[in-house]
Structures are given as C-alpha cells and as structure tokens.
Amino acid sequence: GDISFANGDIVLPGTIICGKLPGKTMLITGGVHSGEYVGIQACVELGAELQPEKTVGTIVILKVLNRPAFENRAGSLGLSDGKNLNRVFPGNPNGTEMERLAWAMTKEVFPKVDYYIDLHSGDDFEDLTPYVYYAGKAAQEVMETSRKMAEQVDVPYMVRSMVSSGGAYNYAASRGIASILLERGG
C-alpha cells in the first residue's frame, strides 16, 4: 500500500507490520537513490515475507523514498530539483522536493522509530563491494547499538561514519535512533 506524509503531499509505497507482541519500532528504507534497485527489491520482498505473528514490535518499510525519479526512470537525484536526498537531511518544510521529503521523514517518521536500516546498492553506473556504515557521531549508546546492528550484516567491510547530517541514517542517529546504511554492491 501507500503511506502518506506532509498532509498527503508526499505518498510513498510502504508496508507496516505490527507484531503479535509489543516492542520497538524498526524503519527500513529503500530507494533513497531511485536507481539502486537491490535495496528497493529487498524492501518489496521483506514487506511480502515478514509475518506479524513472528514479529515483535513494529516494522515500517518505505520501499522507494525517491518515488518521482523511480517512476520516471530519471536516475537517483530529485526529479524536479536535481538534489541528492541523502545530502539534504534534516530538510526544509518550504524547500525543494527532496528537502520537503527529508523534512517529512525528520518530523513525521524519525520520532516514531527506535532503529533504522537504510538499504542501498550500486547505482546504474557503479560497481561496489558490499559494506555497511554505522553511525559514529551520536550519543554513545546510539553508536554502540548501531555498531552491533552493523556486526549482524554479512559483508566484508564495516565503516564507522563520522557524519551527523546530510544523510538519512546519519541524521537519524544524531536524533537518538540507532542506524546503519547497507550497501549491497551493484
């Protein structure tokens, strides 16, 4: 289905799985860069496979954040503004398309989640070795939990990021949300 933000101005394909037992909330996003299809496909498959009766807490999956560019096969930047969504967080409520999307995520989604996994892959033109970034510039507990999340991923490289704004997962970590960004190669 679709999930609406910003009073209905932003509509994204998503799935919310409410577990049988109460617990924390995990956000999983794909399509920050609309040409990174591996993360988008992983979100689609997760949304179809996860079962509420086997889930504790809530999982929110936003399958394609940069929906306009994805639907128009227009590359990974914002369709109307040419901006990289992963460089504009926390966003601006009166800004460009990507800045408004980042703002909606910052104000409407991040306050409701405890953990965040941002799925990426090599874009159309990239050839990447899989790796995972974890938040390294946040409160100590957030950094430690982010590192533990990253350690669960089977990739050859793990990188501690020292950035606290611009990217979705970095900004989320600066707001107290344990976060990782997974690059699955391309």
Question: Where do the protein language model's features map onto the residues?
Answer:
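Structured catalytic-domain cores with a bias toward divalent-metal coordination
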Residues: G1-G186
